[in-house]
Amino acid sequence: MTLPDAIPILAPLASWFDAVRRDLPWRAADLDRPHPDPYAVLVSEVMLQQTQVATVIPYFRKWMQRFPDLAALAAAGEDDVHALWAGLGYYRRARNLHRAAAALARDGWPGDLDGLLALPGLGPYTAAALAAQAFQWPTPALDGNAFRVAARLLALEGDPRRAAAALRAWLAPALAAHGPSRLTQAIMELGATLCAPAPRCGPCPLRGACRAQREGRTDRIPPVRARATPREAELHLLAIASPSGWLLRPPTASGLLAGLWSWPWVAAEDLPEAGAGTDAAAEAALPYGAVDGRSWPGWVQVYSHLRQTVHPGSLRLATTPAAPAGLAWIPDPDLPGLPMGRRDQRLRDLLARPSLLPLDRVGLAAARAVLATDPASDL
């Protein structure tokens, strides 16, 4: 693949960025020197993986107040890390960032890109973006925005990711010429603001050099990638209380909610039909003197690969059974500080609101299913 010289083509982009760049809390004031705080760049780049800038900013500020440097994060407990990350999603990022901080606090910052790539959670894009912004290394960082900018500028046919190696070689001299940090962030800024999926070509600093714009093909370059249809699921999410506290699922090492506490739940497809009879009769059939069953309107919780229809409910027991397998009773005062994902945090927040809706027969059947898992004895 023969590509035109990137140095003159991208020169207007660097100047444009100096004039319009957004004031983001992790950006250095001086883009001609190494970043004064590489840790801040690391945190921002990990948070920005699959999360929009506007969402990241408040989380970044809170994070830097609580864990202002590598040593503070490395010394933190896992629960503290997950609690501060709660709500940002993709929780594996928090675990990897914690592990990376421990390695960096112990060994110091690597001296090359391969060393950054060896850190937990740093793939080719994140490592290259960190290298360029923090250390002024001319390492091309190619994410969705950068691929889109390059594909339109050069009128690349097909998926530009297939040309990743050629694009890195094309960009590297321009990074060295215009400043790695400045040009890397300029490409990010252009892709996020003007060269978005629906582009605004009028004010674009690269309009005169853009082949896709000249050829009237910006709407077709790059081609839209088909997205997998998320799997559908329906579940009953239950906050069950007793004199000993709340019944919860402790964090696991892997899976969708790894590192987080969650409420017990039952898949709707695993419950029998509600059948005949009254809600009062169904509640009376529950063990352990169940009282005060409540529910709230449900919602749809969306993950990258999954859509969950959630039916939230709560139930208070008069006595405390043994915790079913995989669950644990947690004292009431500990509940607010537990790290939870958005779905479970939402039910925790609902507990503070009064509900006039009783827990219906299906919800009560779900509670029975949770409590029927080998309750060996009362505590």
Protein language model regions, located:
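Catalytic cores of DNA base-excision repair glycosylases
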Residues: 4-7, 12, 16-219, 230-232
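Intrinsically disordered, low-complexity, charged terminal extensions of DNA damage-control enzymes
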Residues: 1-28, 34, 192-379
